[in-house]
Amino acid sequence: MTLSVSARHRLGTFELDASFTSEGGVTALFGRSGSGKTSMIRIIAGLLRPDEGQISLDGEVLADSGKRLFLPAHKRRFGYVFQEARLFPHLSVAQNLRYGRWFTTGKDTNANDDRIIDMLGISHLLQRRPNRLSGGEKQRVAIGRALLSSPRLLLMDEPLASLDEQRKAEIIPYLERLRDETKIPIVYVSHSIQEVARLADRVVVMKDGKVEAEGKAAEVLSRPDFSTYLERREAGSILSGNIESFDERHGLAAVRLNAALLQVPAKKATAGTPARVLIPARDVMLALVKPEGLSALNILEGHVTGISESEDGMVTIQMDCGGDIIQSRITDLSRERLHLEPGKPVHAIIKSAALDPY
């Protein structure tokens, strides 16, 4: 599957001028609020007609402003999952799911329906009405309805944005199964680095209506300058490595990076598989000498490569630890007391890290 998108569109004072391609799997449109992600996915869906541009899927032209061609949304055979579930309140879950079948043609596919229902873990909800579902359950039903329409492409616009952290944690594993088992190409809009790092095969970074970076997720997310696109609270390092071993008793995975071996909390992990490690900058302390007697499991030796200041009295210190780029967010006073400057040797004390196998 090859999706090619090029669009220019003005909305008030905001101008979208962006292009990208997707070769299947999960392509994440990532960026801060107002970067143009939702406008782009609405253009792909056919819900917004661009002023200029062209969209094609596997060689089929869906929109071409030069030829005045625009295929309506209902003829594109795309599934769409919104921020809110948008279920019909007067219908049961089973009836909401069957609604998706109205948009597909072909033979009866009860076996496929059952597979999707099982994959999303909603078989026990079929007779309930939406008002008796949790937020996470509603979104799983909405995803099921979109899948039952047999879409050529699944569009997901911030599907977890309206959920609290507990509900997000509940639904993420189902999205992983969706990615791995259905093989339906997905365009996934999000401003959450945790979601993107866990789900995406390819990342398109958007800012002010333009594409700033594009490529394989492992490559884009590991770039030293990627943190500039993150909210301050999410700033940090995303490193690629391989799982060497898993300590089931202590729930720790040993992840080999370029030079370091990190111990990272994990419920399960398989030795020999690739993984990404998320290290929040706010959870990295710095020391000039290697400390002893700490509870922190990971202490990396490196040197300062860059310092970025912000208006809130905080600075971001970038370090090279054996080829792995680590970031730490500390106060400007701490920077002064440690006399930190590019080239200075330091030890990075990692208080927490998250593992995302892929």
UniProtKB/Swiss-Prot annotation:
Residue ranges constituting the ABC transporter domain according to the UniProt record: 1-233
SMART domains named among the record's database cross-references: AAA
Localization annotation: Cell inner membrane
Reactions the enzyme catalyzes: molybdate(out) + ATP + H2O = molybdate(in) + ADP + phosphate + H(+)
Binding, ATP: 31-38
Residue ranges occupied by any Mop domain in the UniProt entry: 293-358
Membrane topology annotation: Peripheral membrane protein
Similarity section: Belongs to the ABC transporter superfamily. Molybdate importer (TC 3.A.1.8) family.
Function according to Swiss-Prot or TrEMBL: Part of the ABC transporter complex ModABC involved in molybdenum import. Responsible for energy coupling to the transport system.
Protein name per Swiss-Prot or TrEMBL: Molybdenum import ATP-binding protein ModC
Organism ancestry: Bacteria, Pseudomonadati, Pseudomonadota, Alphaproteobacteria, Hyphomicrobiales
